[in-house]
UniProtKB/Swiss-Prot annotation:
GO terms assigned for molecular function: ATP binding; galactokinase activity; magnesium ion binding
Organism: Haemophilus influenzae (strain PittEE)
Site (described: Transition state stabilizer): 28
Record-given protein name: Galactokinase
Gene behind the chain: galK
Domain of life: Bacteria
Listed GO biological process terms: galactose metabolic process
InterPro entries per the UniProt record, alphabetical: Galactokinase (IPR000705), Galactokinase_bac (IPR022963), Galactokinase_CS (IPR019741), GalKase_N (IPR019539), GHMP_kinase_C_dom (IPR013750), GHMP_kinase_C_sf (IPR036554), GHMP_kinase_N_dom (IPR006204), GHMP_knse_ATP-bd_CS (IPR006203)
Length: 384
C-alpha cells in the first residue's frame, strides 16, 4: 500500500469520514553537490518515488491532532497559543512548520485532524524530514488557502528545521521536495534559488543503496562542518565559499592551511564540489556518463578525504558498485554523511549485477544488511 492510500484509509477509519485534503511530498537523492547548499553553492538532486503523505480535514476549533501512522504516535497542539516543543522528535518538524507559517500569517489558526504516512527510510540521508516539512507546509497552504509558493513552502521547512528542530541544514532538501520534476535532475543555485532541469538519460537507472549505518544530523558533526566552512569564508573575506573559485582557493590554500588545516580541507571540498556540479550539468547534456562517473568518484573521494564524512561501510559500497559499472556511470555517498546511503547512476542492464555484488559481499564483510532501491526521478509536492 502506498503512503497516500495508507494515510487516507487510516484517516477514514479514525474519523469515520473521508479526508478533505491529501498532499504528498517526495524524499530526494542528491546526485552531486554535497554540503554545498549551506555554502550558497550548487547542488543536483532529484525527487524520488518515496515520500510522505498527509490526509486531513478541518476542525471547528484551533487544535491540530496529528497521528503518525508509521510510528503509531499522536501529537496534539493548539494554534491560538505559542507552539511549544514536543518530546517527540517527529512532532517538532510538524510544529515548527506550522509555527513559522503563523509568523507570516498570524490569522492562520485553523484546527485540523491529520494522518501522516511515509515510506522514506528514516535516518538514511534521503530526506524523510524535508518530505515531512514540505508536506505539512502544503497542507497548511491548502487548509488556510494561503498565498504560499512552493519555494516559500520549502524555505519555511528549512527555517523550521534550523530554528525549531535544531539541525543547521541548508535549503536543498526542501527545495527539491517542493520543486522536483518527473524524469529530471534539478540543478539548484542555493543562493539565487534558480533551478535548471536536466533530463535523466533514458537508459540510466538511479540506484540507491542504504548502508543501514544510522546517522543523526542534530547530534552529529554536521554543525561543526558548517562552522569550519564559515571560518574559511571569513578567511577569504567572502559571504560564503560559493564566492571562491578553484583558482582563488589554490592561490591561498597554503596560507589557510597554516592557519587552520581543517578549515582548509573543508573549504577545498566545497570549492571543488561546486565546480563538479557545474561540470556534471555539461556531462549530462552531452550524455557523457564516463565524465559524470569521474565527477561522482572525485566527489566521493573529496567527501572521504577532505570533508571526512564517510564511514568504512559507505566507502566499501561505493567500491563494490564501481567494480561493476566501470566507466559506464558513477557512484558516491549521498546525504549528510556518517552513514546513510550511496547513489549510483548506471545503465539499466547493470542493475542486476550491482545488486548481486552487494548482496554477495556487503553483509558478509560488514555485518550489516543493505537495502537496495531502484528509483525514478519524480514530481515534487502535490495535492492528491
Amino acid at each position: 500500500m502506498t503512503p497516500i492510500q495508507n494515510a487516507q484509509q487510516i484517516f477514514n477509519r479514525q474519523h469515520k469520514n473521508l479526508p478533505e485534503i491529501t498532499v504528498y511530498a517526495p524524499g530526494r537523492v542528491n546526485i552531486i553537490g554535497e554540503h554545498t547548499d549551506y555554502n550558497d553553492g550548487f547542488v543536483m538532486p532529484c525527487a524520488i518515488n518515496f515520500g510522505t503523505a498527509i490526509s486531513g480535514a478541518i476542525r471547528d476549533d484551533h487544535i491540530w491532532n496529528v497521528y503518525a501512522a508509521d510510528l503509531d504516535e499522536t501529537d496534539e497542539f493548539s494554534l491560538n497559543v505559542e507552539i511549544p516543543k514536543s518530546e517527540h522528535k517527529w512532532a517538532n518538524y510538524v510544529r515548527g512548520v506550522v509555527k513559522f507559517i503563523q509568523e507570516r500569517y498570524p490569522h492562520f489558526q485553523q484546527g485540523a485532524n491529520l494522518v501522516i504516512s511515509g515510506n522514506v527510510p528514516l535516518s538514511s540521508g534521503l530526506s524523510s524530514s524535508a518530505a515531512l516539512e514540505v508536506a505539512v507546509g502544503k497542507f497548511c497552504q491548502q487548509l488556510g488557502d494561503l498565498p504560499l509558493s512552493h519555494t516559500d513552502i520549502a524555505l519555511n521547512g528549512q527555517k523550521a528545521e534550523n530554528q525549531f528542530v535544531g539541525a543547521n541544514c541548508g535549503n536543498m532538501d526542501q527545495l527539491i521536495s517542493a520543486l522536483g520534476q518527473e524524469n529530471h535532475l534539478l540543478m539548484i543555485d542555493c543562493r539565487s534559488l534558480e533551478t535548471t532541469p536536466t533530463p535523466v538519460p533514458q537508459d540510466v537507472a538511479v540506484i540507491i543503496v542504504n548502508s543501514n549505518v544510522p546517522h543523526d544530523l542534530v547530534t552529529g558533526e554536521y554543525n561543526t562542518r558548517r562552522q569550519q566552512c564559515e571560518e574559511a569564508a571569513k578567511f577569504f573575506g567572502v559571504k560564503a565559499l560559493r564566492d571562491v573559485s578553484v583558482e582563488q582557493f589554490q592561490k591561498r590554500e597554503a596560507e589557510l592551511t597554516a592557519l587552520s588545516p581543517l578549515a582548509a580541507k573543508r573549504a577545498r571540498h566545497v570549492v571543488t564540489e561546486n565546480q563538479r556540479v557545474l561540470d556534471a550539468v555539461e556531462a549530462l547534456k552531452n550524455n557523457d556518463l564516463t565524465c559524470l562517473g569521474k565527477l561522482m568518484e572525485a566527489s566521493h573521494d573529496s567527501m572521504r578525504d577532505d570533508f571526512e564524512i564517510t564511514v568504512p561501510q559507505i566507502d566499501y559500497l561505493v567500491e563494490l558498485v564501481q567494480l561493476v559499472i566501470g566507466k559506464s556511470g558513477g557512484a558516491r555517498m549521498t546525504g549528510g554523511g556518517f552513514g546513510g546511503c550511496i547513489v549510483a547512476l548506471a545503465p539499466h542492464d547493470k542493475v542486476d549485477a550491482v545488486r548481486k555484488i552487494i548482496a554477495d559481499n556487503y553483509e558478509k564483510t560488514t555485518g550489516l544488511k543493505e537495502t537496495f532501491y531502484v528509483c525514478t526521478a519524480s514530481q515534487g509536492v502535490r495535492v492528491i
